[in-house]
């Protein structure tokens, strides 16, 4: 005789119901993983327990991407079949979908900061770890890029300041050189022009600061006469 079909009905005993849920849930997640690997299918599985605890599986570790794809597909199907989008039923379904998606996003956000990890299996924890490692690599890459850009800007500013400093030093040296030349001209402007003798007197014409002057020598005494 063939094996009789077991009638499916709700398990009344809470303990047995919880044990059965845990076993069937593990088997369901395993089957979802198997079909995704064997058939190269994109699988997303969402299960809520009677207490409202969420269990999920996504073969590509991104449930959001699967949900977005499902929404795009559902939207395309709705475009082919005319429906009354203004009906209360349509708005209720849309609200439920958005609420479910919001819950998924909030839960994933908690997972990313290390909260509410008790509900995750080993595989889910490994997937989460992989996501965080990938995110950290992108963060470090962006941080290093910004650091290199900041260093490049500082180096350009440093070169500009050095160039300004060199120009200022050059101008100072040119001014010092000009001042020395002017000082040398002034010191050499006092020179003898003619010498002549008048009896016991000796006179000499000189130029001092652009003015002609006559120096008269009498014995050992020198008299300066300004013309």
Swiss-Prot record:
Purpose: Probable transcription factor.
Tissue specificity note: Flower specific.
GO molecular function list: DNA-binding transcription factor activity, RNA polymerase II-specific; protein dimerization activity; RNA polymerase II cis-regulatory region sequence-specific DNA binding
Domain MADS-box: 3-57
Record localization: Nucleus
Naturally occurring in which organism (per UniProt): Solanum lycopersicum
All copies of domain K-box, residue ranges: 88-178
An individual GO BP term: positive regulation of transcription by RNA polymerase II
Protein name: Agamous-like MADS-box protein AGL8 homolog
InterPro entries for the chain: MADS-box/MEF2_TF, MEF2-like_N, TF_Kbox, TF_MADSbox, TF_MADSbox_sf
Keyword annotations of the record: DNA-binding, Nucleus, Transcription, Transcription regulation
GO cellular component: nucleus
């Amino acid at each position: 005789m063939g094996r009789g079909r077991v009638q499916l009905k709700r398990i009344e005993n809470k303990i047995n119901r919880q044990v059965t849920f845990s076993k069937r849930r593990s088997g369901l997640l395993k089957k979802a993983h198997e079909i995704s690997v064997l058939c190269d299918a994109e699988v997303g599985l969402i299960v809520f327990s009677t207490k409202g605890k969420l269990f999920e599986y996504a073969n590509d570790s991104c449930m959001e991407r699967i949900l977005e794809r499902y929404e795009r597909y559902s939207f395309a199907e709705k475009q082919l079949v005319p429906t009354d989008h203004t009906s209360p039923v349509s708005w209720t379904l849309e609200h439920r979908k958005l609420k479910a998606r919001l819950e998924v996003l909030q839960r994933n956000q908690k997972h990313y900061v290390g909260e509410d990890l008790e509900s995750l299996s080993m595989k889910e924890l490994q997937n989460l770890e992989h996501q965080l490692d990938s995110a950290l690599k992108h963060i470090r890459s962006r941080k290093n890029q910004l650091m290199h850009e900041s260093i490049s800007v500082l180096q350009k500013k440093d070169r500009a300041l050095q160039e300004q400093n060199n120009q200022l030093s050059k101008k100072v040296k040119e001014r010092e050189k000009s001042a020395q030349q002017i000082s040398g001209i002034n010191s050499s402007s006092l020179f003898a022009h003619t010498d002549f003798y008048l009896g016991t007197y000796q006179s000499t014409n000189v130029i001092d600061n652009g003015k002609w002057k006559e120096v008269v020598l009498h014995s050992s005494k020198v008299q300066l006469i300004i013309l």
